[in-house]
Swiss-Prot record:
Protein name: F-actin-capping protein subunit alpha
Coiled-coil segments: none
Subunit field text: Heterodimer of an alpha and a beta subunit.
Family per similarity comment: Belongs to the F-actin-capping protein alpha subunit family.
PROSITE patterns: F_ACTIN_CAPPING_A_2
Function: F-actin-capping proteins bind in a Ca(2+)-independent manner to the fast growing ends of actin filaments (barbed end) thereby blocking the exchange of subunits at these ends. Unlike other capping proteins (such as gelsolin and severin), these proteins do not sever actin filaments.
Gene3D superfamilies to which the protein is assigned, alphabetical: F-actin capping protein, alpha subunit (3.30.1140.60), F-actin capping protein, beta subunit (3.90.1150.210)
Organism field: Candida albicans (strain SC5314 / ATCC MYA-2876) (Yeast)
SUPFAM superfamilies per the UniProt record, alphabetical: Subunits of heterodimeric actin filament capping protein Capz
GO biological process: actin cytoskeleton organization; barbed-end actin filament capping
Keywords for this protein: Actin capping, Actin-binding, Cytoplasm, Cytoskeleton
UniProt GO molecular function: actin filament binding
Transmembrane segments: none
CC annotations in GO: actin cortical patch; cellular bud tip; cortical cytoskeleton; F-actin capping protein complex; incipient cellular bud site; mitotic actomyosin contractile ring
Amino acid sequence: MSINLNELVDSLIQSAPPAELKQVSQSLSSLTKGTSTSSTNSLIQDSIEQYAQENIISIDNIIISKYNKDENSSKYIDYVNNKLFNVDWQNQKIIDVESYHDNNNKRGSNYDELIQKLSQYGDDYYPSNFAFTVIPESEDQLRVIIIGQRANHDNFYTGQWKSNYLITEQGIKGNIDLDIHYFEDGNVRLKFNESINSSNNNNNSSTLQSGNLINNASRIVNFINEQENATMVKIIEQFNNLNQKSFKNLRRLLPVTRSKINWGSAIGNYRLGSDVINKK
């Protein structure tokens, strides 16, 4: 079965961990040097932009997704800082920044307060690189996107926590995604997804019992905090269960010989003991 270059490049980029897009892009550019450079670079950049729009990424602590794409240009909107910007996809940099003015006036009365509380929430609970945005999709609908990302290529690991919440008067729903990649002398990747819906009994929070949710920043952030804490506990419990049960059963048990080791003068008779004695 044959596969063309376009399909191969797109497949490799779409399967890349979110914190490694720059490295994947550079590797693909090096591997495809024998082809038409301009067309290949354009293909790589188009694939990365498609990845960003569908999966949501952050560059320089700014969110990039299909949700904050400007309808009238090729740029994206940074609602938190009121900026329009382009992206150098291959080098993963924000470029061509200009001021943005929201002429649609979809932001509610609590918008600035919500920005402030989410910023404080990130400082309190995210020790890694933190990015967020609040997208006013209509007068009675907000989208909150949060990304916590850590990349340590020297120690062979990257990871991203991504939360995407849709907030309406009826409640809050969304998803939490975790993507961790460890690649020292191997290739191990963990992907986790948790759906959030305030209307479900299991996720129903006391912070959402009264009305006027869309204009109450404190209740929105408190709900997000509760759900993310609960998800973190769930992940830790699953890790412990995996380690104590599934992985433990894979370990090779040592045979029980019931023989005693003489830790006195006879220790030199054992291979390890003789090696230690001879090296003195």
